[in-house]
Amino acid sequence: SRIPQVYGVADSSTISPEEASDYYCQRKAYIEEATVLSYGPAAAETALKLDDGTTEPFQYEFGFGTGSDAASSLPVCLFAVAVVCSVICAPVFASDYSSGADDIQRCALYGRKRLGGTRVLAALTLSAALYAACAAAFVAITLAVFGPDGTSAQLALDALVLGNLTMNGVLLLALVAGLLSVLAMTAFTLWLSAHMRRPVAVLAVSLAVAMSPTFLMVLLRGMPLGDWLRLLLPSGGLGLGTGMIVDIQAGKFLTLGPVAVWTPFAALAIPLLEAPLFSLLALYSYTRHEGR
């Protein structure tokens, strides 16, 4: 139960009926106190605004969020898909550089921008299709065994969950964030491949970036810098022990002066920007390489 957490006690049996009846007001105070302590007044104000639309009382329903470990196994699956996509995309440009095939291709009528654009689009489409297949299989198996879950995320995950979210909504957000992060990692790998001559080197750098969020959360645990660095990476939503579900659960913020951004919003917005950015950079780098 998340009730003892809100009241700051170890056992719910120590909470009187009068105190328990005031749970929702107590939870608001807990959110404000915890957020001010960790991120300052601006973040606390943002947190309370986000929580204004929360449906009360909270609902409990048995399903995948309360009866399985889907919340911990889904990030592992998403990370595995990202690694596979990186392996597939690493040689897209670099293999032709190393073999010399690029010298022939650049002399063809459509061997410059059109060929590069086609390769980028094909790689992104393949990654999206692979992700969709894996995500569909995961969701189908999970829902078939445990069923959907309308439990309020505040009960299933943490009292610091903000907004009107059920576990069904959390799963949907995690899948969307995973897709955006996989596409961002694919585009980043293509950019590396357009820059480097050896596919092995491209893959090594790509895998290092993919694993960086996990290491950052271990080395910089509890430090705002760790969240900044993690979420700015194209793999920010794919680390083991990190990701959208953890961000929703932890009630974290990115703060810059008076501005505070809830980390789940950043986990959606940043890869949405990085995927087209790195795709364009990959195409630009490939075109420049052809002109040398």
Please place each PLM-identified region on the residue numbering.
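Cytoplasmic juxtamembrane regions at transmembrane-helix boundaries
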Residues: 99, 107, 191-210, 288-292
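Short helix-to-coil transition segments within interhelical loops
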Residues: 106-112
